[in-house]
Amino acid sequence: MSSRLREIARENAEIVAAGGYRTRSGRQVPLAAALAEAKAGTRIYGPNRIIPGEVPPGRGGATAVEVTGESSTVAARRLVETAGEAGGRAAWQAPEGPSVAVLNFASARNPGGGYVRGAKAQEEALCRASALYETLLEAPEYYAVHRAGVSTFYTDRVIHSPGVPVFRDDRGELMESPFRAGFLTSPAPNAGTILRQEPERAAEIPAALARRAERVLEVAALHGYRRLVLGAWGCGVFRNDPAMVAEAFRALLAGRFAGVFERVVFAVLDRKPATREAFERAFA
């Protein structure tokens, strides 16, 4: 845990309470209205199928897939900034809402995981960069269900947080020009714990990943997102096999969701080259 990261969480709480912040250049950036909309629009979906039958097709053409070594927020900003060039929705206050959604590799039982305590995983980084944490507090039932459960397979529920303000960069600096993105919060199965506590169920992990990834993509499609930021979901402390996670998404994007999304970025910010390479092989 990092004292500096705890301080950022504390500063973010002050920014939210104040309804905005002042940049280094002296510009006042308002966040209150955008955050109120995001909190009011936060919903829990699942665990059952969300879109019955076929998924409505996109605007035509194959989905472009990238595998990169950037963070989820850097990838999201890049997709938001280029959305207008491709006919997508624009970034900050477009009436239809942002065109980009980011998968949050979530803790099933604690909003933001260890964000308030200064932890360093992907969910915590997203919460430091944005107002995501505030929207997760709007979904207490999601966490109650998982706290009541014993198995670390968790459930196929997804929290959708629309139009969340993103206002810090990867260094923790406040942005001169924030942007908005949707967030899809879903925990991967905790493969490490399953292998220790329920080894007889290890063979169920691939199906659980595939089913849960399908729920994530259904929520994205339901809300009309055209650009997604995914990644090495559950491949850190949850110890899922990167090749297995990559294959779950590959099969869905080539199958039921073929052509539904314009662009999908797998942002794999991992010290181990093998993790990113697993996704590069899957989408070669």
Question: Which ranges hold each PLM region?
Answer:
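Macrodomain-like recognition of ADP-ribose-binding/processing modules
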Residues: 1-228, 232-284
